Amino acid sequence: MSDITSLTLTELVKNIKDKKISSEETTKAFIDRGEKSRDLNTYITEDFSNALLKAKSFDQKPNFDLKLPGVPIAVKDLFCTKDVKTTAGSKILNNFIPPYESTVTQNIWNEGAILLGKLNCDEFAMGSSNETSFFGNVQSPIDKGLVPGGSSGGSASALAANLTPITIGTDTGGSIRQPASFTGTVGLKPTYGSCSRYGIVAFASSLDQAGPMSKDVKDCALLQEIISTYDEKDSTSIDFKRNEYSKELTNNIKGKKIGIPKEYRVDGMPKEIEDLWTKGIEYAKDCGAEIVEISLPHTNYALPTYYIVAPAEASSNLARYDGVKYGFRSKGENLIDMYEKTRSEGFGSEVQRRIMIGTYVLSSGYYDAYYLKAQKVRKLIKNDFDEAYKKVDAILTPSTPSAAFKIGEKTNDPVSMYLNDIFTVPVNLAGLPAISIPAGIDVKGYPLGLQIIGKAFDEQNILNIAYAMEEKIQFKNKITDWWIK
């Protein structure tokens, strides 16, 4: 096997099942590449020695009926992993070792996968560039000095750099789709309630959703099949008939109606994004789809709505971090002083900003003017999508308003950073599924993605559309391994 790490998940599983490669051989290959790639800063915690032991154990008693037989995988450090440090990219959780496993990761281990380690992310998933992490920013494998996107930046970087064959992220306002777009990979944000939130460090509970990130759509479908289960431990988990997404995957989308929302043609959109969208429409037509112009009139208000609702929920969720039961604790002269010092020293500046925004909009004098109004607008945004889906089967948009930007370019301009999520946040507010697929490059050769948005619980449909378009686009990620000396 020339280069195990460059294989897709589907290829890797086939080779392991055909006994062409062992789990130990596979795991060693990913560990070796991981050790050579530390300059990317993708890992917060490496669990390489345990991974090798588990791989050897699997090879001694293999079970090839499993969907991920002995496959090594690294996951975002927002998922609780029993007895393995889970930090959420924050100083305040730097010493936290969970006594339990998240449902999503448990589903993955149940299918035979092996944990390689925990991947870097923006602190508490608050960020669009992986620059807010206490453990330092992540480099994109696309080019030196480039952000990989966020908050699942470590996941996207590790995937594109072939440090893991697949991975999982979380998406609150675009945190799977935006980094996937920036790194030339595939990222699916499932319907809210499709994947359990149990054991995921919470940011905004009505928006957070776990999802798969992969090298191609087929791998994405397989991982979604594994992680999407009903869970009684999560009150927002929804019990519905789930598809066998990978088995039901088809490139036949003839006659599907795909909507193009006129409101997404925003002022100042770069020509390369306009051109990408136009090409995407042509690809969809070539696949046999019918293009329909639609209107989503209230999505213009999605960004301000999101940046009221999400910080409000974050300020409530993060109130639990006080230094008493677990995590970082600062010394204080009394209890109140200890609380103040722990939180001011333990949280980074972006997290503090969002806590303050959230506390403000929930305060008695401003609750009606901001939070309540935002929830009403959120309902209108959901209604816009409901109306659109009376005419179309899916919606096609760009994933992001630009290609990846340089590290440090937007750190002093929060509004500019927040605008990165302009095409992704409406989906979270409406609780819908959406997938980003690589579809082209800009003038510098940086990847650009297209987003396909579906009806609630219609992941199969958007996976099929993505699969058909992927075949037409024939995107090839150009990674030069610039970071390996």
Swiss-Prot record:
InterPro entries reported in the protein's UniProt record: Amidase (IPR000120), Amidase_CS (IPR020556), Amidase_dom (IPR023631), AS_sf (IPR036928), GatA (IPR004412)
Report the EC code(s) recorded for this entry. Answer: 6.3.5.7
- Per the UniProt record, one Pfam family is Amidase
Which processes are annotated in GO (biological process)? translation
Q: Name one GO cellular component term.
A: glutamyl-tRNA(Gln) amidotransferase complex
Instruction: Decide whether keyword tRNA processing is in the record.
Output: no
| Gene Ontology molecular function | ATP binding; glutaminyl-tRNA synthase (glutamine-hydrolyzing) activity
At the top of the EC hierarchy, this enzyme's class is ligase
**Keyword annotations of the record:** ATP-binding, Ligase, Nucleotide-binding, Protein biosynthesis
Q: Which residues act catalytically here? A: 76, 151, 175
Q: Subunit info? A: Heterotrimer of A, B and C subunits.
Task: Tell me the protein family, please.
Answer: Belongs to the amidase family. GatA subfamily.
Show the HAMAP family listed in the entry.
GatA
Any idea what this protein is called? Glutamyl-tRNA(Gln) amidotransferase subunit A
